[in-house]
Amino acid sequence: MYLYGASGHAKVIIDILEASGVQVEGLIDDNPNIDQLQGYPVRHTFTGESPFIISIGNNKIRKQVAERLQTAYGKAIHPSAILSPTAKIGDGTVVMQGAIIQADANVGKHCIINTGASVDHECVIGDYVHVSPHATLCGNVHVGGSWIGAGTTIIPNLSVGKWCVIGAGSVITEDIPDHVLAFGNPCRIIRYLE
C-alpha cells in the first residue's frame, strides 16, 4: 500500500496498516524537505503506483488529490474496529482504532472514521467525510463531504449537508444545510462557508 501525504495522519494510517499485516511500500508528498516518515521512504512524484490511500486529513484537499491521481485505492481498517458484515466501506477510506460501524451503514470513498467514532445502523456517509474521534452518529444519519468534530452527537434520522464544519462537542438536533460552520449544544449555524 502506498500513501499520499507524509504528516501526522499518515503516521496513524501506517500504524493501522502494520497492525493489519499490510505492507507499506512508501509515501509520496509534495514537500521536498520530507525524505522519510517512520522509517518509510518519501518520494515527491507520483508514477502510477497502487493501491493508494490519501493520508491527508483535510476533506477538500483529499478530494482534489483523488480527482488528480485517478488510480486504484485501498482501504485501511484497524483490527480493533468493529464493522457489521452488512456495512459497506468505500475505497480509500480509513477506519481507525476502536471505531464502530453498524448494520447497513454505507461509508463512501476517501472517508476518515476516526478513533472511537460510532456510525450506527443505516447511516449514509458521503465521500470525503471526516468523522472525528468519539463522534456518535445515531441511526439513519446522512452526512455529505463534511467534517464532524470530535465528540459530536447527531441524533437519529438527521442530515448534515455537504462541506460543513461541525465544531467539537456539538449536539445536532435538527438538519444542517450545505456549506455551513455550526457548533454548540444544541448545534447552531454560525455562518455560511460559501
Regions found by a protein language model. Name each.
Residues 32-84:
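Phosphate-bearing ligand-interacting subdomains
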Residues 52-55, 95, 183:
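Redox-cofactor binding/interface segments in oxidoreductases and associated redox assembly factors
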Residues 1-45, 93:
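Hydrophobic, well-ordered beta-alpha structural blocks that scaffold small-molecule cofactor pockets
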Residues 8-11, 60-61, 171:
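Short alpha-helical
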Residues 14-16, 64-68, 107, 177-178, ...:
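Short amphipathic alpha-helical segments
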Residues 1, 115, 124-127, 132-194:
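Glycine-rich hexapeptide-repeat left-handed beta-helix
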Residues 70-122:
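Hydrophobic, well-structured mid-protein blocks that either form specific transmembrane helices
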